Amino acid sequence: MKKSISIILSLLFIVCFSSASAQEQEHKPDTVTVGIYIVSIHDIDFKEKEYAINFWIWLKYKNKKFDFEKNLEVPQAKTVDKTFSIIDTSGDVVNMQMKLQCIMKDNWKITNFPFDKQKLRISFENSQFDSRYLVFKEDTVGNHYDPRFFLNGWLIDRCVVTNGINASETAFGAESFAVPR
């Protein structure tokens, strides 16, 4: 009997509620196109509530200050190891590719074991810029995982890429921020 895994990739970024000036509020955020290709998922550990994942991520954006090589965050990751990166800044658009290996933390719902379904979630954020300055747009062309790889005893039934806003319930110590809602 194979268990089912759904992979949900979220392109989230932190939103801090602030009392920004009128000029900042009129500023239109830059778009960052992001794609992912999962190479493997392994070492699923229900006791420790974690799993390992290897994947390629690519980002295309105009604002060089975003510097995703330094500012990319994977919030649910216990560890993030960058094994390869390449950046092309020769034109008006920054094209970046990175290969990452992560140990992800997740909550497992195993009450229906061995017939349970699990959803693995991966989110990405920029540690220096929030939704006032950037929005993510998912690259939906092609597969998001290698259909030839498999997890013994598991079936990958889908891979969904979405984007959204992660509203933080803190002002991160900044007195200029309004009280979080």
Label every PLM stretch briefly.
Residues 23-181:
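Soluble non-transmembrane domains of integral membrane proteins
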Residues 8-16:
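Bacterial N-terminal signal peptides
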Residues 2, 16-18:
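Generic signature of intrinsically disordered, low-complexity, basic-rich segments
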Residues 4-5, 21-24:
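Terminal, compositionally biased non-globular sequences in eukaryotic proteins
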Residues 1-9:
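Bacterial N-terminal signal peptides that target proteins for export
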